[in-house]
């Protein structure tokens, strides 16, 4: 018998990341890949990248010449379909990806662009422009550690699973184009009708946000100050001196937010009270009520930006940039562009692993150790809730040890996230809210103070 042996060569998988640095991280996680030009290649994988957006929707004039003129007569501009045009500065990168996609060696494609709507759009536009017909899968990264990358490769999402996100991304892009192009040209034409050219930009997000700022500014300008008086008194007791503030015990809430129990609207009324109680003895009574204060939920991007602005004066853009560096460069935080403040319900073991690393490597280690030692880290729906997460969960540490010294601002954001991650497992703080009411000549004065109550 004669046998013919045919060697079958397995195809390669092309992985497309959003930026070169992420492509490098993925290539190192896979292992065994060599740098070839601007991509990485091995026996089974080719890892390449975009540089952000490589394509954009065409300008109106490219659909119909007259639509390029900025006048009311040529509005609205509503194409029957949207076409793509390469972005000039990144055309070389697009051509490189086209070549890889058309390679006979490549038999499937993995989308490893950022795990969100914009990353999905970047990849989908590349697929549309290159007319790719090869099978597509999605690498959905929650963090950039080697372990997280390899785990994501074990749980690739199908093209069908990602279609709703792709549709949302394209719809958002086309809506921005329609509102931006038509709104900007209409407002510019209106403001330029008496001569000149007065560019007036309009945007789907920009313009409503501007309206919020304008409304607030109008309220500030129309604000009419009203003078009011308060009466404060110092009371001497054996233990020292305490201060009380006059209030009207018969006060009832009004629809006027300026009216409050402690406010007096005539100077003579305040003076009358001061004269009546000066140098007189009073009777004091106290009532205390226990209260608790729980840690707020884990951070999403918006709450992290607010906190960083409040504590450090960082702008929203600065905080995002720092968090992105801690995610991509340092691998210390999970994906930052999230709107979720909870974790998956099966994440308890992972949380304990992360806290164990934090306990050994962070300046906050003693607090992480206590949380683990005293069994604070337990399942609770406030923290672990699948209904409160979508494509991403809350921003938390990855459990990776810092491999380089963080900058001052990076350390601040990392510590902020780590503190919240530890604190959310601690039991609520316990307080006593005390009200001390002092009555002098039938006038009431109030002192409110809060003190921590000891735990059993």
Task: Give the ranges of each region predicted by the language model.
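Long, highly charged, low-complexity internal segments
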Residues: 46, 54-87, 99, 197-324, ...
């Amino acid at each position: 018998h004669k046998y013919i042996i045919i060697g079958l060569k397995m195809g390669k998988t092309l992985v497309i990341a959003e930026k070169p640095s992420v492509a490098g991280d993925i290539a190192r996680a896979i292992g065994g890949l060599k740098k070839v030009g601007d991509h990485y290649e091995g026996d089974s994988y080719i890892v390449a990248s975009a540089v952000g957006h490589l394509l954009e929707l065409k300008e109106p004039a490219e659909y119909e010449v007259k639509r390029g003129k900025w006048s009311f007569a040529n509005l609205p501009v509503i194409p029957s379909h949207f076409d793509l045009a390469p972005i000039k500065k990144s055309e070389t990168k697009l051509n490189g990806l086209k070549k890889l996609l058309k390679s006979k060696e490549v038999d499937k494609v993995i989308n490893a662009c950022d795990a969100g709507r914009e990353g999905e759009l970047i990849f989908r536009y590349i697929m549309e422009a290159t007319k790719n017909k090869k099978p597509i899968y999605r690498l959905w990264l929650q963090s950039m550690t080697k372990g997280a990358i390899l785990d994501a490769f074990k749980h690739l999402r199908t093209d069908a699973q990602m279609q709703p996100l792709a549709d949302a991304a394209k719809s958002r892009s086309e809506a921005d184009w329609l509102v931006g192009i038509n709104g900007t040209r209409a407002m510019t034409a209106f403001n330029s009708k008496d001569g000149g050219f007065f560019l007036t930009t309009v945007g789907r997000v920009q313009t409503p946000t501007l309206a919020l700022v304008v409304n607030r500014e109008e309220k500030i300008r129309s604000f009419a100050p009203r003078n009011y008086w308060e009466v404060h008194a110092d009371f001497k007791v054996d233990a020292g001196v305490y201060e009380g503030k006059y209030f009207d015990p018969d006060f009832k809430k009004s629809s006027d937010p300026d009216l409050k129990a402690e406010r007096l609207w005539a100077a003579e009324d305040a003076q009358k009270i001061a004269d009546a109680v000066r140098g007189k003895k009073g009777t004091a009574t106290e009532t205390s009520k226990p209260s608790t204060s729980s840690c707020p939920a884990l951070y999403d991007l918006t709450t992290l930006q607010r906190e960083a602005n409040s504590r450090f004066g960082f702008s929203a853009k600065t905080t995002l940039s720092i968090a992105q560096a801690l995610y991509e460069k340092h691998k210390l935080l999970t994906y930052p562009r999230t709107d979720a403040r909870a974790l998956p319900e099966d994440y308890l073991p992972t949380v304990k692993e992360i806290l164990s690393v934090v306990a050994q490597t962070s300046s906050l280690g003693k607090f992480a150790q206590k949380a683990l030692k005293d069994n604070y880290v337990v399942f609770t729906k406030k923290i672990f809730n699948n209904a409160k997460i979508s494509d991403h969960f809350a921003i938390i540490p990855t459990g990776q040890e810092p491999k380089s010294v963080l900058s001052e601002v990076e350390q601040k954001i990392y510590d902020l996230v780590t503190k919240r991650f530890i604190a959310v497992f601690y039991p609520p703080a316990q307080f006593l809210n005390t009200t001390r009411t002092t009555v002098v000549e039938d006038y009431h004065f109030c002192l409110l103070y809060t003190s921590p109550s000891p735990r059993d």
